């Protein structure tokens, strides 16, 4: 999935990019609000953030919610400011990709987390709380195994970032 997103970013003629998972869990009604805040505050990324910590989220299984919350706390340890680093709904500046593409992992399905961890610049981000809906026709790729693989990758990425 990440490589498909990267291909779309490379081909885009626009300076602002919207990523939105195609599983119908994100409501497009938030796009206008996200873009307005993105422009008003000259942000690098605006994230459609699920209500993971409040538990008011109908779109996640208990395992998926647990793994997502674990990753939120993991990201906080490393001062990455978002309540939803695993979101599949965000707007960002194409220049972030262009300036950092050689540092991105580029595999898997969590492009936002890749951006947040591996960008070589301090990104100005903001979360916008969104409603997140139940998945109807597909299964989540998130599991405990995937959680541990992601943490392992992100730890290695952070170590590289610190020592390079």
Q: What are these model-derived regions, one by one?
A:
Residues 1-11, 16, 28-109, 135-152:
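Acceptor/aglycone-binding surface of glycosyltransferases and processive sugar-polymer synthases
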Residues 22, 50, 130-132:
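Short glycine-centered, acidic/aromatic-flanked micro-motifs in structured strand/loop junctions
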């Amino acid at each position: 999935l990440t490589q498909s997103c990267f291909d779309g970013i490379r081909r885009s003629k626009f300076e602002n990019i919207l990523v939105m998972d195609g599983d119908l869990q994100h409501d497009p009604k938030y796009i206008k609000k996200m873009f307005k805040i993105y422009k008003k505050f000259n942000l690098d990324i605006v994230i459609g953030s699920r209500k993971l910590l409040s538990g008011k989220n109908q779109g996640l299984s208990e395992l998926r919610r647990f793994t997502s919350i674990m990753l939120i706390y993991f990201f906080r340890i490393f001062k990455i400011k978002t309540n939803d680093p695993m979101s599949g709904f965000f707007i960002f500046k194409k220049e972030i990709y262009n300036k950092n593409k050689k540092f991105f992992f580029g595999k898997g399905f969590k492009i936002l987390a890749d951006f947040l961890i591996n960008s070589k610049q301090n990104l100005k981000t903001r979360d916008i709380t969104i409603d997140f809906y139940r998945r109807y026709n597909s299964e989540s790729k998130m599991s405990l195994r995937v959680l541990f693989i992601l943490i392992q990758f992100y730890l290695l990425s952070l170590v590289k970032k610190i020592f390079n």
